Amino acid sequence: MVRDGIYYVVAFVAVAILVGYFTIWPLAIIPLLLAFFFGWFFRDPERQIPQTVGAIVSPGDGKVTDIVTVDVNGEPRTRISVFLNIFNVHVNRSPIAGTIREVRYQKGKFGNAMGAISADANEQNIVTVEGEGQTVIFKQIAGLLARRIVFTKKVGDVVGRGERVGLIKFGSRVDVIFTSESDVSVKIGDHVAGGSTILAVARVAHGNAPVLSGTERGGAR
């Protein structure tokens, strides 16, 4: 379980104890059930990180809702959107190994994250990672329920492919934007797992950025 979930669990357990002590114990079942729910909701399972050279992995669990070509500084790029519902794991992971070059917070709306305009209009965190001979942008996008974006890294940090870098509370959307000279490995409607599902493989030269081998360890901070 990620650290952010501990507060919810402890709070509801405390409420259950107080309710059970000052009233009748059956009423304590409700806050206890909520404590179990939040413990499950903020789960943080280990993932097997792919070792494919040039692989771009999904930053989060969810369903692929969009694969389009977008313009980035006058150049065509591929954007894959993954929608996270309330039942998905909400931990976000780096799509590639490399160095974080930019982290930019953008204020915005809290509209339906599945909508086409949410990619630009909604509140979001925009992260640029450079490594393995490529530059990848991924966005943590807020939605109707998800109004709390957490990012645990900073500019200059070196991350491994699939390494935990944050989370979006209560579901939303992550976008990955990368060079169009890549072989896309998923299609719209596919269900993907953060850190382990390969979204695409770049057809570029690769550097020596770190790639975590096997199962990545350690929780989101």
Swiss-Prot record:
The modification Pyruvic acid (Ser) is found at S172. PANTHER family: ARCHAETIDYLSERINE DECARBOXYLASE PROENZYME-RELATED (PTHR35809:SF1). Heterodimer of a large membrane-associated beta subunit and a small pyruvoyl-containing alpha subunit. It catalyses: a 1,2-diacyl-sn-glycero-3-phospho-L-serine + H(+) = a 1,2-diacyl-sn-glycero-3-phosphoethanolamine + CO2. The keyword Cytoplasm does not apply. Catalyzes the formation of phosphatidylethanolamine (PtdEtn) from phosphatidylserine (PtdSer). Its EC number is 4.1.1.65. Belongs to the phosphatidylserine decarboxylase family. PSD-A subfamily. It is found in: Cell membrane. GO terms for biological process: phosphatidylethanolamine biosynthetic process. Binds 1 pyruvoyl group covalently per subunit. The active site is at S172 (schiff-base intermediate with substrate). This is Phosphatidylserine decarboxylase proenzyme. GO terms for molecular function: phosphatidylserine decarboxylase activity. Its main location: membrane. Its cofactor is pyruvate. Pathway: Phospholipid metabolism; phosphatidylethanolamine biosynthesis; phosphatidylethanolamine from CDP-diacylglycerol: step 2/2. NCBIfam families: PRK05305.2-5. It comes from the Bacteria. Is synthesized initially as an inactive proenzyme. Formation of the active enzyme involves a self-maturation process in which the active site pyruvoyl group is generated from an internal serine residue via an autocatalytic post-translational modification. Two non-identical subunits are generated from the proenzyme in this reaction, and the pyruvate is formed at the N-terminus of the alpha chain, which is derived from the carboxyl end of the proenzyme. The record marks G171, S172 as: Cleavage (non-hydrolytic).
